[in-house]
């Protein structure tokens, strides 16, 4: 019997990872379907009048296409504002500032992106976003597994260790938080500068073992 030749998922079946405390949800599509040629994710604003696409530029030449799957959004493209009801496609040229605010509750925007002529590189830090998404959903152990996978993918990068320290600080696991932060600083002293400003560590600063 041949291997399965397709993957199928309804948008309602996608993971729902909170991005913040305001109701914005990250709905991984590429990860769910195993796509490697381009990036694609969905974002849902549970409330109206909140950001559903962060304001940003694509400076590396990546092309991005957005599709409003449900609800309604107001896109900012350069200096223009565009009303985009459900069913609207929006393509932004590389370098164009873009972002979107949900005009209605439950607005979902699906984003697709890749750099022309360049093999798509899956972000090594995607699992970090998954880890914090699980944590915000109250699933600490699944979050810890995702964080471990991110570190294993890039063991010599300070960012993974730093984010693991933040994760453990948020779960009030002081020993693990300090251990990861020490390792991050060993890999790159910049981690100490970031730790000085990161409020995740505020409750740990009086600990004599805290390395900053």
Where are these regions (language model features)?
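A short hydrophobic beta-strand segment most commonly corresponding to one strand
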Residues: 104-120
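A short, N-terminal "cap"/entry segment at the start of jelly-roll beta-barrel domains
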Residues: 1-56
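Helix-start (N-cap) detector for alpha-helical repeat units in TPR-like alpha-solenoids
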Residues: 124, 158-159, 192-193
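Short acidic-glycine-tyrosine-enriched beta hairpin
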Residues: 79-94
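Short, conserved beta-strand element in jelly-roll/cupin
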Residues: 58-75
